[in-house]
């Protein structure tokens, strides 16, 4: 199975991607991860990407596509893969199609995990992380016994910059503006399937399998 997984930040996409990867025995390819890996290993493409990343700029499509292509050519992708974080734009989607056509492959399905913005806002802005041990709590769903204090090590809990309400709202805005055209693009190609994210991870997994036609 060759899958693309879409979902807003905080929609639980990573967790589902890991599950599907082990269920189908296909690699979970996170573009962010392979980009960082190339930078760390100082590959030619990694060096080029780093120049942009160091300036806080987006890495150009041609570099990202080349990095993704190299990853898709590895042996473990022969029987399928799960792409996460790519494509983000229609231009990238078209480039990916060309790459796959060269490899004699095509995308089977594009899975979109849908969670209402207000739900994501509640999930993310309620998260609290321990400064000492990194344990994660939630003011509504998993509150610490003592406010602001970690149950595990007694460390201080804090809210990450990424989880602040204004930041989350901005990230969601950017995500929708960028991804909506992509969702339409794959819908028109008859590849899009949608799973509605639930409160419980296991319930979301059920929705995901149903959307993919796997029980």
From Swiss-Prot:
Gene Ontology biological process terms in this record: AMP salvage
Region (LID): 126-163
Binding residues for ATP: 10-15, 127, 136-137, 199
Keyword Transferase: yes
Region NMP, residue ranges: 30-59
Organism of derivation: Caldicellulosiruptor saccharolyticus (strain ATCC 43494 / DSM 8903 / Tp8T 6331)
Keywords noted in UniProt: ATP-binding, Cytoplasm, Kinase, Metal-binding, Nucleotide biosynthesis, Nucleotide-binding, Transferase, Zinc
Domain remark from Swiss-Prot or TrEMBL: Consists of three domains, a large central CORE domain and two small peripheral domains, NMPbind and LID, which undergo movements during catalysis. The LID domain closes over the site of phosphoryl transfer upon ATP binding. Assembling and dissambling the active center during each catalytic cycle provides an effective means to prevent ATP hydrolysis. Some bacteria have evolved a zinc-coordinating structure that stabilizes the LID domain.
Pathway: Purine metabolism; AMP biosynthesis via salvage pathway; AMP from ADP: step 1/1
Assembly with partners or alone: Monomer.
Binding site for Zn(2+): 130, 133, 150, 153
Main location: cytoplasm
GO molecular function (one): ATP binding
Recorded catalytic activity of this chain's protein: AMP + ATP = 2 ADP
Entry's localization field: Cytoplasm
Pfam family, one: ADK
CC per GO annotation: cytoplasm
Role summary: Catalyzes the reversible transfer of the terminal phosphate group between ATP and AMP. Plays an important role in cellular energy homeostasis and in adenine nucleotide metabolism.
EC number: 2.7.4.3
Protein name: Adenylate kinase
Similarity field: Belongs to the adenylate kinase family.
Record-listed AMP binding positions: 31, 36, 57-59, 85-88, 92, 160, 171
